[in-house]
Amino acid sequence: MEWKKEKFKKMFPNLFHEIEGSDLPTVLDHLEVCKTIEEAIEIIEYFEKRGEISKEYANFLKSNPSLLKSIIGTRERGEYTRRGLRD
């Protein structure tokens, strides 16, 4: 089955982003190396200020401390340097 790229992107935006997405670390990747909630909130605000995440997504992340606690500290700083961007 053949799909037109724009139609696929419109119908399945998240899947399209995974397939065509950038290899650069996202806000979640940066949150994984944080040690504290305060550091995580600082990272979220930085990404929001740069326009890399929406205000709504930033508010969602900041208003869910239990989610942040489950994300922070799950990756060692420097892993991308050692292993490269693809995992």
Curated annotation (Swiss-Prot):
It comes from the Archaea. To A.fulgidus AF_0255 and AF_1348. This is Uncharacterized protein AF_1363. It comes from Archaeoglobus fulgidus (strain ATCC 49558 / DSM 4304 / JCM 9628 / NBRC 100126 / VC-16). The lineage of its organism: Archaea, Methanobacteriati, Methanobacteriota, Archaeoglobi, Archaeoglobales.
